[in-house]
Amino acid sequence: MSVPVAPFSHLSTLWVQVTGTWCNLQCVHCINSSGPTDPWLKSLDTETVKRHVMEAEALGVKEIYFTGGEPFLHQDILELLACSLRVAPSTVLTNGTRITEKTADALAALAGESLYSLELRVSVDDIDPEANDRIRGKGAFDKAIRAIRLLHARGLLPILTATEILQGDGPEGNGMYQRFRDLLASVGVTKPRVKIIPVFPAGRLAQEGGGPPDPG
């Protein structure tokens, strides 16, 4: 029996695990067991990332995503975003803890001068700060909400990203989306955006004894 072969026509999406598994949090459900110590996957150097972005451009890439680990731990993340935004719409998946006013200003400037759109997904796993921090680490909730407010104030319309299994219901159950929309409205976000994603039984969630330290 022959297996059908689909011809390669173009690259749809480029995912860049820019800081490998290096992260300042150690979330209990992290699919690749990222954390602050001894990352099993190292960060990518700046020139390597730029080279792959250019290769992706030649292959017709339509979207570029930066993930980790925590992308904002990379010392050249803004430079890398400037590079990717010349090629395709770009998205950063972040815990938000490293986004300061200065960083938010720089991101807004990048978005304003770029041909393509910049999107930021900020992870929050519960509307209750204590419940969220049991999952993500002490202080993570307040820092993530601050990041969302900073980005929103600059017109960047960040997406709050939550994991459905930790809410105890599916994405349509018990008003999960509305709970997060209400949370965003309560902190002054006038155009709330919420994305619910599944949690996979892999990485730290599949291990015993994994737990979140304080964010650095």
What are these regions (language model features)?
Residues 37-51, 71-112, 120-143, 163-175:
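Canonical radical SAM enzyme core domain
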Residues 14-18, 64-66, 90-92, 118-122, ...:
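Hydrophobic faces of well-ordered beta-strands that scaffold small-molecule active sites
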Residues 51-67:
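Short Fe-S-cluster ligation motifs
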Residues 123-125, 129-216:
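Radical SAM enzyme [4Fe-4S]-AdoMet core and its adjacent flexible, acidic
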Residues 56, 84, 148-151:
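Generic structural signal for hydrophobic
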